[in-house]
Regions:
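RecB-family 4Fe-4S metal-dependent nuclease core
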Residues: 1-160
Length: 160
């Protein structure tokens, strides 16, 4: 399911985003936004700062949150009769096991993530801050401090 939207970022303008959601399904009154992953995915977070912290391995959680926002912006008709949107990861290696879909959970209290207006506002603020940093010519691009990310990166040779 292709989803797309533009985000108005102060001092930058409209920034287009798009993505392909691997699967949408309904469980009770929750619409699950599911992304298939071939590797491990950390689906725990402390707070929104944790999601945007580049020293943390939160790219999969960030991606699924982005899909929730894109879905809400681009396909609101899919959200009718839905109380919640929830990001999930489905590790491909676990597909033989029953119900191995991993829900994003909050580390405090181990509660499931709920996409609501407060979380959405925090997410948009974090995303806007990240984009302002990326577009700021005074901020140099730096290689990641997480060396494992370089293993499959097509640009790894440029950083060394």
């Amino acid at each position: 399911q292709k989803v797309q939207a533009k985000l108005q970022v102060p001092n930058i303008g409209l920034v287009p985003f798009y993505g392909y959601i691997d699967r949408l399904d309904k469980q009770g009154n929750t619409l699950r936004v599911i992304d298939y992953k071939t590797g491990k995915a950390l689906m725990e977070y402390r707070d929104m700062e944790h999601i945007f912290d580049r020293k943390e391995n939160q790219d999969k959680a960030l991606q699924t949150m982005l899909y929730c926002w894109l879905l809400e912006q681009d396909k609101p008709q899919l959200l009718s009769n839905t109380a919640h949107i929830a990001p999930h990861i489905y590790p491909v290696r676990s597909m033989a096991k029953a119900d191995e879909v991993q829900t994003l959970v909050h580390q405090k209290g181990n509660t499931d993530f709920v996409w609501n207006e407060e979380v959405k506002a925090e997410f948009i603020e974090g995303l806007s801050t990240l984009l302002r940093e990326l577009f700021d010519p005074a901020v140099p691009f730096m290689p990641t401090a997480v060396g494992k990310r370089c293993e499959h990166c097509a640009f790894a040779a440029l950083c060394k």
